[in-house]
């Protein structure tokens, strides 16, 4: 099976195009099987799960799919619902909407349903997409909230445990749109082993099974690699003090460009 038709993980910075070209959503639809897709929509992060679930249901229905189901999970007990678990065994794609990432993790983390979704994703059996809050939960370490517009400092970011879909990353969404570079750097200062991803709105980082990450959409994806960081004062200063971070590697990619995790290199678009 060519890479372009294999299941993938799509991490979306929020506010993806839902009306015109719908390129990111079309890519998820295609990677989930196109007209043969069986897609589950998880709107649990939203305060209005029924409304947001129906919105995405309409979008994917218009594209043409084999089956659609909104997994309207509002309490943790539903994470062991036999009907939902059966659907997850049959589906080809799962889409997690935006909202509140803490709410999403509170409902799904360590449930049989989420454990099986993660397992099937890791086995390359299904595609998984998350937008906004649905993107934030992708790592094991998750940015749960914080501020922006300041210098990097530890008080700028609130961390929590995510869903561990791609455990080696930490994600910030609505990135340049909300001036969140300092927030991502603050998170990286205490977790330099992680690859930081700052994803702009209507932009997606698509993780392939060969270790490559392709950028799709209108904005940029910033890759902050601190694995060779030579120094930080994070452990020496107060929570509100400015942070020093030496020898970071920053790559900013646009549509069609690729970052390779293993090679730790960025590649321009092949035309």
From Swiss-Prot:
<dbReference type="InterPro" id="IPR029062">
    <property type="entry name" value="Class_I_gatase-like"/>
</dbReference>
<protein>
    <recommendedName>
        <fullName>Cyanophycinase</fullName>
        <ecNumber>3.4.15.6</ecNumber>
    </recommendedName>
</protein>
<feature type="active site" description="Charge relay system">
    <location>
        <position position="201"/>
    </location>
</feature>
<comment type="similarity">
    <text>Belongs to the peptidase S51 family.</text>
</comment>
<feature type="active site" description="Charge relay system">
    <location>
        <position position="174"/>
    </location>
</feature>
<dbReference type="GO" id="GO:0042803">
    <property type="term" value="F:protein homodimerization activity"/>
</dbReference>
<comment type="function">
    <text>Exopeptidase that catalyzes the hydrolytic cleavage of multi-L-arginyl-poly-L-aspartic acid (cyanophycin; a water-insoluble reserve polymer) into aspartate-arginine dipeptides.</text>
</comment>
<keyword id="KW-0645">Protease</keyword>
<dbReference type="GO" id="GO:0006508">
    <property type="term" value="P:proteolysis"/>
</dbReference>
<keyword id="KW-0720">Serine protease</keyword>
<keyword id="KW-0378">Hydrolase</keyword>
<feature type="active site" description="Charge relay system">
    <location>
        <position position="132"/>
    </location>
</feature>
<comment type="subunit">
    <text>Homodimer.</text>
</comment>
<dbReference type="GO" id="GO:0008241">
    <property type="term" value="F:peptidyl-dipeptidase activity"/>
</dbReference>
<dbReference type="Pfam" id="PF03575">
    <property type="entry name" value="Peptidase_S51"/>
</dbReference>
<dbReference type="InterPro" id="IPR005320">
    <property type="entry name" value="Peptidase_S51"/>
</dbReference>
<dbReference type="InterPro" id="IPR011811">
    <property type="entry name" value="Peptidase_S51_cyanophycinase"/>
</dbReference>
<dbReference type="GO" id="GO:0008236">
    <property type="term" value="F:serine-type peptidase activity"/>
</dbReference>
